[in-house]
A protein has these predicted regions:
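Extracytoplasmic cell-surface/polysaccharide-interacting catalytic and binding patches
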Residues: 1-67, 72-79, 83, 87-91, ...
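Glycine-rich, flexible loop/turn motifs
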Residues: 8, 12-14, 29, 98, ...
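Amphipathic alpha-helical interface surfaces
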Residues: 46-49, 107, 123, 134, ...
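Surface-exposed patches in mature extracellular/periplasmic domains of secreted proteins
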Residues: 93-100, 153-158
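Structural recognition of the beta-strand scaffold that forms the well-ordered cores
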Residues: 97-99, 126-128, 168
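Short, surface-exposed glycine/acidic/tryptophan-bearing loops
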Residues: 102-125
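Catalytic cores and adjacent binding grooves of peptidoglycan-active enzymes
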Residues: 116, 121, 129-185
Length: 185
């Protein structure tokens, strides 16, 4: 058997590492190691979506001093007045927390994931939300990004189990369905 070594501290984008998008609490024989193609898919989600989501959310609801090169693709952010450094309303920069990204077949089976899950190819992430309002705001920003950039996504699923909220967000290299669902139990 050939042993493969991957640097899990590799940055997929400015604020996201490979380790963040491959972490799991499930112990498996083969680990949770993505293929090169899965890493490229994760990188695309981070660069094209999660960085924009982080910027958009923080511009609207977090620290107004957050900066980023280029204009925001988020329509809600583009309409905001420019930040003034003397603003009394400055809160800390709020990170986007990924609870699940890439899943090996073994991890996917153990966590009860769907057989054809986008997580298996690195095309999906689950984004932690801190309640229904936070979840709806994050989903709205993702939709604004899609509209502002004319990029498509495969799935935007707002999920709830008891008091736990998250967004399942998937982007495939092609054949995206723009499927939007609520799955609250």
């Amino acid at each position: 058997m050939i042993e493969v070594s991957i640097n899990m501290q590799t940055k997929l984008s400015e604020h996201f590492t490979l380790a963040e998008l491959c972490k799991t609490s499930y112990i498996t024989s083969g680990g949770n190691i993505p293929s090169r193609v899965a890493i490229e898919n994760l990188k695309r989600i981070c660069e094209n979506w999660l960085e924009d989501l982080r910027y958009g959310y923080n511009t609207l609801y977090g620290q107004r001093g957050v900066t980023r090169e280029g204009q925001s693709p988020c329509n809600s952010v583009a309409e905001l007045p420019a930040h003034r450094g003397d603003s009394p309303c400055v809160s800390p920069d709020i990170p986007i927390v990924i609870t699940s990204g890439f899943r090996s077949e073994e991890v996917n089976r153990m966590c009860g994931g769907a057989k054809g899950s986008n997580h298996l190819t690195g095309c999906a992430v689950d984004i932690r939300c801190y309640g229904p309002e936070h979840m709806i705001r994050m989903a709205g920003i993702l939709l604004d990004i899609a509209d502002g950039t004319k990029r498509d996504f495969d799935e935007l699923i707002l999920e709830q189990r008891g008091t736990t909220y998250w967004i399942h967000f998937a982007v495939r290299p092609k054949d995206n369905r723009r499927k939007i669902l609520f799955d609250c139990r």
